[in-house]
């Protein structure tokens, strides 16, 4: 009983520290959204205010760093995300639904105004509800696999509540990629083994490959012909202005693979997390032997597997 009371007091104390006014000026320009975790009641909170973030960390919250960036242009803005506080449980709730925001306010939740803006496209934030908990009953995640797993465990899935704009990141390792016959090459029609420098970056949910120097990206069909600027076969990519762009989603990974030389072409396609795990296990079993030159990129832009023949 004493331990329970002590934890409740700590929980309440941490929650009270978070009762500060949200600075509306912070919405004027793009800023990172910071995530915090209250280990005493399981509450997660997001804030645009770095000073608030630092203050809560000093008060005992666990700072979990940058979650995403709030959009700064009106054209990228889907709407506002509102923040509420439950004085009885210490929980913070985030919603774009003003009706829900207003209804909970009338039910006794503290309405804390606009927390940040939701992006039109980006990383969806999924909301879950645990009916058995008395504090920290809601959880938000940008990982669809985690969302699905928790629903199977009994959490109530409440769908996407807002979207975050992922900051631009550079792909690790993908700065020089060896390629071969009938594949994606850099401005040269020689049919022997070629090499090209390709840089890659992710902004929002788009992966862009850009050739270095004055080279252009060409897509070669199995017979050595150029596919020009048409959408690439067997892919979700499009050529535009010498760059190659692909849409990424949070629940999938990207595969760039090169098949046998006799009938090969570069294939960019999406795979699910289960398939990604199978490929990782297969890599561990066979080492570096295999039929593909392959790069696997997760939705956050990290190269999780790199195999070159």
PLM regions: where:
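Extracellular glycan-binding segments that recognize GlcNAc-based cell-wall polysaccharides
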Residues: 27-170
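Bacterial N-terminal signal peptides that target proteins for export
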Residues: 1-12
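Solvent-exposed hydroxyl-ligand-binding patches built from regularly spaced Ser/Thr
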Residues: 171-292, 296, 300-309
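Bacterial N-terminal signal peptides
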Residues: 11-21
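N-terminal signal peptide c-region/cleavage motif recognized by signal peptidases
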Residues: 23-25
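Feature targets compositionally biased, intrinsically disordered low-complexity regions
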Residues: 1, 41, 59-64, 78, ...
């Amino acid at each position: 009983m004493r331990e329970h009371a002590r934890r409740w007091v700590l929980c309440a104390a941490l929650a009270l520290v978070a009762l500060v006014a949200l600075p509306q000026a912070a919405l004027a320009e793009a800023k990172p959204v910071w995530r915090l975790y209250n280990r005493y009641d399981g509450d997660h909170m997001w804030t645009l205010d770095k000073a608030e973030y630092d203050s809560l960390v000093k008060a005992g919250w666990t700072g979990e760093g940058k979650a995403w960036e709030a959009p700064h242009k009106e054209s990228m803005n889907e709407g506002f995300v509102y923040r509420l506080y439950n004085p009885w449980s210490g929980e913070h709730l985030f919603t774009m639904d003003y009706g829900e925001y207003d209804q909970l306010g009338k039910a006794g939740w503290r309405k804390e105004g606009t927390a940040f803006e939701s992006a039109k496209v980006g990383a969806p934030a999924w909301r879950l509800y645990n009916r058995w908990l008395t504090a920290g009953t809601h959880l938000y995640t940008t990982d669809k696999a985690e969302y699905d797993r928790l629903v199977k465990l009994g959490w109530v899935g409440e769908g996407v509540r807002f979207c975050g704009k992922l900051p631009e990141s550079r792909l690790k390792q993908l700065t020089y990629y060896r390629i071969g016959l009938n594949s994606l090459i850099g401005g040269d029609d020689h049919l022997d083994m070629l090499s090209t420098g390709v840089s890659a970056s992710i902004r929002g949910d788009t992966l862009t490959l850009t050739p270095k120097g004055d080279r252009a990206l060409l897509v070669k069909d199995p017979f050595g012909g150029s596919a020009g600027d048409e959408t690439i076969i067997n892919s979700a990519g499009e050529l535009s202005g010498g760059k190659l762009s692909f849409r990424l989603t949070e629940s999938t990974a990207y595969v760039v693979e090169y098949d046998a030389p006799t009938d090969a072409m570069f294939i960019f396609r999406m795979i699910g997390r289960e398939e990604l795990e199978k490929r990782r296990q297969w890599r561990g079993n066979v080492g570096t032997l295999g039929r593909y030159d392959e790069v696997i990129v997760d939705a956050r832009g990290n190269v999780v597997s790199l195999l070159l023949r």
